[in-house]
Every structure is written in structure tokens, then in C-alpha cells.
């Protein structure tokens, strides 16, 4: 178990996984065999989005945060997900417009059309969790509801957060549970947060 301070969010400890829109298919070039301990092999975060449904038309691949989609702004109709990705209806992850829509999904070569209300709506996007391994333990705290706006994340225990009392939504990745605390140095009220099943994220 790991720890962190939170509750109004100040320290943290982690502890294991919840889920959302998941699909597990085999990638063509990366083995997803489980290791000797039964855990999934590392899976690089990567998102390929298309200008038409059914993964047709012009496409663009993302492996990092994209606060602006530039020439692909308001053009995404479908995507293939490797990892855990959030797409936002406004630039900079809806940080300046928390009324804008967003959409998140995850999986291993999981391809899907955007919901009808989100077709041609995405203006920014980012992954959550570790960039080189969607199955690695992490806690990702967002300063608005529904994983919008600025964030703070941790892969290990943290007796004090950089941004006190800011988290309004959280995603947990990996298999470890996390304990969040009201005050620094693991003091005050606490709560445990679990990831999803089988190494998938908890929202």
C-alpha cells in the first residue's frame, strides 16, 4: 500500500484497481503476455485518432500531452487506444472551460468511434498514468471534476503534495491501492483508493 496526503489533499500512500471503457485485444507488434507473476507486460501509451468513424481517413498519432490539437482540432471521429487517454472539448484540457465535454477510454489496441455528442469536438488530449507503462502504479489528481484542468501525480509515497487542497477527481493505475490523508506526513482523516480489476485503471 502507498500513501499520500490529500483529503483536502495533502499526503499519500498506495495500496490495488475500477474501470470504464475497456477492451483487451492483442497488439500486432507488442507482446502482451503476462510475466511470471501474472502481471501484464508494460504497454506504451499511444493514441491514434482519425478524421472519420471506423478508423478511416487522415490520422494522427499521439504519445504525449497535446494541449492544442492545431490542424486536427475538431476533426476527431474515432481513435485506437493503447493506454489510458482523455480527450477534451476545449484546449488545455478544459482548464478554462469546465462546462466543455470530455471522453475517456483505455485498452490495448482498443478502437472505437467517438460518442455522437463528441464527434468533431476534441481540442486537446492527454494520457493518464506512466508514459511508458499504462500498468504501472500511479495516482493522478485533477484540479477539476471529470479529470479536467491542471493535475498532480505520483508514482511513490509523498508525505506532502505540491498543491494542497486542489484535487477534485482522481485516477488510480496499476494494482496498488493508495491511501490519501487530510494533512501532511500521513496525518488526519484518510481514505483508500483502489485501481480497477486486472491492472486496469480506477476512476
What are these regions (language model features)?
Residues 2-4, 8-203:
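Compact beta-sheet-dominated domain cores in extracellular/mature segments
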